[in-house]
Amino acid sequence: MVVMPPQNSVNESEGRYLQDGFWQHGRFYGSWKPGKYLFPIDSEELNRLDIFHKVFLLARDNKPFLAPIRRTSPRIMDIGTGTGIWAINVAEECLSDAQIMAVDLNQIQPALIPPGFMPKQYDIEEPSWGPLLADCDLIHMRMLLGSIQTDLWPQVYHNAFEHLTPGIGFLEHIEVDWIPRCDDDERPANSAFVKWAELFLDGMDRFNRSVRVIPQEHRQMLEATGFTDVKQEVIKAYVCPWSADRNEREIARWFNIGLSHSLEAMSLKPLIEKLGFEAEDVRELCERAKRETCVLRYHTYCNIHVWTARKPGPQQ
């Protein structure tokens, strides 16, 4: 049965609204094309997505994008916009004359939006992006791993390519590699965070919606699609603020908050529905991982991957 969440679970102060959906495993999920988006859409999840916007800004010198925009009234698409925070940030602070289409499977964007901001509910796994904005200067994609069927990534990149302006259209794609890493072995021998990541990745593989970041595969897919000037950047995000570097500490503070909100939200469905866990066991593992990521002597980090690519002109 489709139900609406209790009124007090909606973050009204930010003018957001939730579409029809359903409760499962103690969280609220969207009901449009159920099973495609495996993570919640409740107010706690909206906060998580906004926290990661801050993480990515800090990791990229407070710049929401790096692609050169050459037209005075650019056309931009934000694919998998979530709360719309990136698109709103660009519209309000960077490109006030831009036409920005914010595309997502779920209608969780705010009711009050800036001029030029166009929310669009659409399934980007469709073979064609016909209804979406064409002739784009920039297409931005972020944290889509797990939301795209694993074998459909070439199709997604192809559709992005087709909707960019030849010669000046750029794609920017950002993902978090959830595999915990450590350069100095300063982490516990039986790490709960490592265990969580292994199970989470395994469960998502079984949904055929992999969250594994394989950098060379994405580069090869972009080049095979026809993109040129393909570049990749890797940024460390420590899970707690132990570093002597001020910027690394600030990224880590926000990443720690985002991670603490992510553990349960992302792993409930894959661990319960694909690996046979009980909900309380998932939450217990997440709590242990959360406590571990707050210990300053553990120097664990995750990598943030950024790919940028350009659609060549007709003579290139």
Curated annotation (Swiss-Prot):
GO cellular component, one term: nucleus
Enzyme class: transferase
Main location: nucleus
Compartments it resides in: Nucleus
Induction: Expression is regulated by the VEL1.
Keywords from the UniProt entry: Methyltransferase, Nucleus, S-adenosyl-L-methionine, Sporulation, Transcription, Transcription regulation, Transferase, Virulence
Catalytic activity: L-methionyl-[protein] + S-adenosyl-L-methionine = S-methyl-L-methionyl-[protein] + S-adenosyl-L-homocysteine
Subunit structure: Component of the heterotrimeric velvet complex composed of LAE1, VEL1 and VEL2; VEL1 acting as a bridging protein between LAE1 and VEL2. Interacts with VEL1.
Function: Methyltransferase that performs automethylation. No other methyl-accepting substrate has been identified yet. Component of the velvet transcription factor complex that acts as a global regulator for secondary metabolite gene expression. Controls the expression of the gibberellins gene clusters, but does not affect bikaverin production. Controls the expression of the fusaric acid gene cluster. Acts as a virulence factors during infection, most likely through activation of gibberellins biosynthesis.
Family (UniProt): Belongs to the methyltransferase superfamily. LaeA methyltransferase family.
Name assigned to this protein: Secondary metabolism regulator LAE1
Lineage of source species: Eukaryota, Fungi, Dikarya, Ascomycota, Pezizomycotina
Gene, per the UniProt record: LAE1
